[in-house]
């Protein structure tokens, strides 16, 4: 049997979900025999590949680059898992939305001018610094998501439960203690 092509993506978040994924410990060795990791922050691949079987997406959609890669992922991936609370709800990155939709300039002003200790200036470099969206979004607001794995971060046992089911061609049944936020 050919290994499934798996990707992990890190959008607007803290990388805690990827750290929790690494907490799979010995199961990572088993997983390595079942999958081919084709795209991830932990490997050096620059372009998201075609024909990906499963992608775990960590983080909220905060900027134009996040939105662009997300549409590419959906077009090239069979199963998308919204991985962690930021991807599922927007969570911490969406705190800036409390200032109101469209207040991106106020957020940048506060972060880079008012609270700067050295060289106060808003970073602007076309093609280098992506344009922030007017509002932070969870993944499912931009593309269809097949499965949701909440948690901040989801613990390794929940990640394993989901991966075993998805890789086995089954629909994950996350319920009870397997389905909780925070």
Q: Residue ranges of each PLM-predicted region?
A:
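Iron-sulfur-associated redox domains of electron-transfer enzymes in respiratory
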Residues: 1-182
């Amino acid at each position: 049997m050919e290994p499934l092509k798996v990707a992990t993506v890190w959008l607007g978040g803290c990388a805690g979900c990827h750290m929790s994924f690494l907490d799979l410990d010995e199961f990572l060795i088993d997983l390595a025999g079942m999958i081919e990791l084709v795209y991830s922050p932990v490997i050096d691949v620059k372009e998201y590949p075609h024909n990906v079987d499963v992608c775990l997406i960590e983080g909220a959609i905060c900027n134009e680059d996040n939105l662009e890669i997300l549409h590419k992922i959906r077009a090239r991936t069979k199963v998308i898992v919204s991985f962690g609370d930021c991807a599922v709800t927007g969570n911490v990155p969406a705190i800036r939305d409390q200032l109101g939709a469209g207040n991106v300039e106020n957020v940048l002003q506060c972060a880079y001018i008012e609270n700067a200790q050295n060289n106060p200036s808003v970073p602007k470099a076309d093609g280098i610094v992506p344009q922030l969206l007017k509002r932070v979004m969870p993944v499912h607001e931009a593309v269809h998501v097949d499965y949701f794995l909440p948690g901040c971060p989801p613990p390794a046992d929940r990640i394993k439960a989901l991966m075993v089911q998805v890789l086995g061609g089954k629909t994950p049944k996350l319920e009870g203690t397997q389905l909780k936020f925070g």
